Amino acid sequence: GAMLRREALHSDDPIAGAGSFAVLPRGAEELLPSDPAELAEIGVEVLPEGTYLCMSRWGMPYEPEGIRAVVACMDKHALQPIGNAFDFCYLDTTSYDESHQEDFCCIQVPVVLK
């Protein structure tokens, strides 16, 4: 999936600085350091429990329309992002057919009320 930086979400280029991420399977934490500083050093981030604004959509992670719709929804409902947004790809090119030539994704952003 794609990780979209919180600092860029309300900008003219909400995908600026975006990068990729991977979801590790249950049990992988046993192979990783337990110290948060060590995890950060190797680029591992654990998504916290909390309230997330989620929006499923057809589209590509490098197209800004999806995150712009999420940002508009956050603004409309007085929500503030408290972390990076994550665009999870559920169905990719392996699921393309005549009606859909795009990925099916879910953008998730940790939020709080303003």
Stretches found by the model and what they are:
Residues G1-K114:
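A solvent-exposed interaction/effector surface
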